UniProtKB/Swiss-Prot annotation:
InterPro entries: Ribosomal_bL33 (IPR001705), Ribosomal_bL33_CS (IPR018264), Ribosomal_bL33_sf (IPR038584), Ribosomal_zn-bd (IPR011332). GO terms for cellular component: cytoplasm; ribonucleoprotein complex; ribosome. This is Large ribosomal subunit protein bL33. The keyword Transport does not apply. One of its GO terms (biological process) is translation. GO terms for molecular function: structural constituent of ribosome. Belongs to the bacterial ribosomal protein bL33 family. It holds the Pfam family Ribosomal_L33. Keywords: Ribonucleoprotein, Ribosomal protein.
Length: 66
């Protein structure tokens, strides 16, 4: 029998500063992305977490894109 997938889904977090600003004041070119899981029942809205961006070389807010 197949197992139920459950309520946890895989999401992608993307740096807000890398996306909005061009390559000004950056260590290198690119957009920082992290993948993580979230519980759909507990967190229905889009997730926003402060994480380290290796392109900006500082901690920035990362927002859920998918």
């Amino acid at each position: 029998m197949a197992k139920n997938k459950g309520v946890r889904i895989v999401i992608t977090l993307e740096c807000n500063e890398c996306r909005s600003n061009p390559a000004i004041d950056k260590r290198s070119h690119g957009v920082s992305r992290y993948t993580t899981e979230k519980n759909r029942r507990n967190t229905t809205e889009r997730l926003e977490i402060k994480k380290f961006c290796r392109y900006c070389n500082k901690s920035t807010t990362h927002k859920e894109i998918k």
